[in-house]
Amino acid sequence: QNPSAYLTLEDDKLLYFGQKVDGVIPYGVVGSTIVINGDPICADSDFPVLLAEFKEFCQRSAHNLFFISVTDHFLEEYKKQGFGWVKNGEEARFHLADYEISGKKGAKMRMNINHARKAGVVVHEYCPLKQRDAQIEADLNRITNEWLQQKKSSMLTFVMGTVGLENPMDKRYFYATDADGKIVAFIVFVPFLGKRGYMADVTRHGTGAPSGVMETILYDAFQVFKNEGIEYGSLGVAPLAGLKNDSSNPVEKLLCFAYNHLNDCYGFRDLYRAKEKYSPTEWVPSYYIYLPKIPTPDMFYALVTIQNPHQIREAAEDLVKGCAQRLRNKRTSPTHQSKPSRQVSWTASSSTKQPDTRKQTDADKKAD
């Protein structure tokens, strides 16, 4: 039921297998914290036993626990066993039978797709388990390299999968070609809900990809899934989206502050907007679950580090650059020149970057 479940098969996870019941829990270790991606994988009836067993396993080795990307499916049992919890974002999900882009809500999506179609974009599915194509795979690798150069930051791990062409298993690959037949972008989907749903896990575009290409790939892939009888599509979780600014939970207050003020470090707002433009049919809440009930700073450090060991350094550099740019803008603005200088106040509005709609964005999630 959790779209993150398939990522258990990636090589960056350690696996805990149940001793008393059948089940598996994917995790990683940073210092004294064990980080778990998604819910434990087991039958619903076995979940209480598996969770208690894993909790004891971690406590015996004096490790704290931090679950990420957890659904509300087992939320009450986590609470019952003494875990703390807080909403950490919302998953953009699509009920494919109801998904459409007509009307005002889908206007931007239609515009982007029409732009791509006019530019000659055509979407194809690549099925490596049926027949490998060395040229297609070389092009997908080229796009990954171009995408990384555009990002100028490290790639996320643990919460995201890999392209995985060496062992595709149940992954689905959709790519787009331009008017010249050149591959310019691709999306890798992973299954969830027993293949009743597919999540866009890896989303990448190359240099010079036409505007609207990612929207076109996603829409066409969803149409293929819909025709196959698949029920759901997903773009994964938009981190820190949908939190309450007036929450009494101190952890949620901290996360709200990050969402409102630290977009120089991580584009929380931009990522939410990138998913929102696809017009999801529902936003599914996602949670952090942790023990002890009040998470310590080193637990949050583990959360960041396990996804990208370089992210803290890169975030600090981005924050400094963002602050410096705003300071330069303030000094050169007519308002600033006509009035006495004042102390700069970094407000939520001034620290929020506005997305460039002419450029392609990574629908994932995840800005990895």
Predicted regions and their residues:
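Intrinsic disorder/low-complexity segments enriched in small, polar and charged residues
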Residues: 338-341
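A conserved beta-strand-loop-helix scaffold within acyl/acetyltransferase catalytic domains
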Residues: 1-35, 63, 67-84, 99-112, ...
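Asp/Glu-rich intrinsically disordered low-complexity tracts
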Residues: 356-358, 362, 368
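Glycine-rich phosphate-binding "P-loop"
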Residues: 35-45
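Active-site rim elements
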Residues: 258-264
